[in-house]
Amino acid sequence: MLHGLRRLLTKPEGNTLAAPPPGPVPAAPQSQRAQEANAAPGAEAPPEPQAARKRIIFDISDLIQFLRESRIPSGIQRVQLNIIHYAVTDFRDRTNPVIVYFDQAQNDWLHIPEDIFLALYQATEAHDEADEEAFLALMQGLSKHQPLAAHLARFSPRDHFFLVNLGSSWWIENYFQKIRQLRKFHDLRYVPMIHDCIPLMVPEHCPRALVEDFRHWFFGAMLQADAVLTNSQWSGKDIRHHLNAAFPDAELAIHPIALNGNMRSHLAARALTEMDTVRHILPSKAPFILCVGTLESRKNHVLLFKAWARLIEHHGIEAVPYLICLGRAGWLFDEPAEFLRANPALHDRILLISSLTDGALATLYEECLFSIFNSFYEGWGLPVTESLSFGTLSLVASNTSLTEAGGKAAVYFRDNDLEDLSEKLEMLIFDTAKRLALRDHARANAEIRDWRIVADEFIDRILATEPSAAQRQEKCLRLPLGHLIHLGKAPAATPPSERALGDLLRDGLNWHRPEDWGSWTKPGVARLCLPLPDDMAEQDFLFCLRLRGPAFATPIKINIFADGEHVFGPIERTIGRGKRLGLWFSLRLNAKQLRLDIDGGAGTSLGPNDRDVGIGVTHLMLCHAEDAEARRSFLRAFPEFGLASRIKGRAILERIDIPAP
């Protein structure tokens, strides 16, 4: 299956670009081109500029991260692979695709040539152990490719780019700063895919770090995105709910696109070759029911296990089919695991399997009596769609988006209702005629589409996206008066607007990731760009900034700009080792934006194998000069600026008057 992969890895020219090829020569100004044309009698007129093209940049960072751990894709990875495969092949003339991933070591997006992506796609379709070495070499070579910025320099400055992530990106450091940096040089529209709002809707079923990272990313995305793709009407409703709660006046296009693609067309061809694998799992011809999904608390496996215990109690173990639970170990599986340990009879009827090849999965779908899918909350329900695409009946919890995934084809049980689940299981297991009739009904009513059609809908939505992020930021974001803004990871109670604002203020790429206390700048100049309230004219304001010194005394310079014009500085100070510096700037400006350029100099290392940093920035606040309560709240928040601490040299608090321009 991967016969071309080794050839691809050993082409004489190689796929690695040691240095970027020469970029396009900048077009001369129109007057200069006219002079050159007139200078040469009989010379042809210069060619007209090429028409602008639309180009989709597919960010597959999470897909690459997944493939580094497993060559067998899960549901969301299959979705990405199928859609981008069609974008690169059948719809290439429309998408003009650029494929990238974020390389953590280089802190940059790297371009992945299309033939390399197609080789990766082929590698996930096949699982020949003989080609494993070639697959690993392919993955290891990704970091040698060209940075995205250099690759984009090949194209016309008139081109329109659409940055699309069909997976997730909230784990990438300073993702939105990188997007804003690209927008400074290109006409870029950002169109993320949000599969669900599970960390916001049921945080009790998610790791705390995931909840915080997702919350931070989500509200930033609501301001950075030009449109949002999602997989169900239910998820679209959730996204709209949180958007409106955080930014009541925000307008954002949200496009639900059903992920009801035909997985059978991709998996079934390998099903017969995997029959032996399945028969190693089960006794020959043993009936079984299939449950596909991560082993985690949100999937509510304990309800299934209780139902199986009840079936065994009522009908005897020999009459009860096996339950195969296929999925990786996830978050908080303790309760169902403990239930299994406490009920030995279940050990002979419930099998937990962490991973299988696509062919083995296809065999399980085709051979099972029916599938079952239970969950407290979903964004779509890919296992339901997968099952129906194989013509296999699915018994599904009646909640969230699962009724969209199952449509009129699935059989439903009431949410988290053991009685109803047990009744439906008994009907489907012991009434063969009824089960077969429901299966035939499912096959006649399942709304399954070819992945080419799904990809076509995605591409239509993406390419129709108009710029909207800048207008939304202008409308929804202004530095609030008298509010302390944290520039690190915001506490859970932080209002979404302030959470998003803290991320938006850090401009450019010279910032490290936010931490609980604040953010380190990188060596050199880091920028804070502050959108000011509309009523700044003819009023006196106080701008408060709190800085943190690294392990060594650090000289800094601060220059202040209003609407791009330099108005004050440099302010030169030295922050002692680990000390805190509070600067209160008194100013009167008639401007829409205040910018601070903070120069941390050559920087300081945080330790062996750690980062080089400039200075730490923790909090800021803008208030009316006469707002004594706001000033007191700043001092209450940071006791080190009290008189006793300042006398002992632990902190410095300084007021700086900036003359009106």
Segments the model singles out, each with a brief description of its role:
Residues 537-556:
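A short beta-strand element within beta-rich, extracytoplasmic domains
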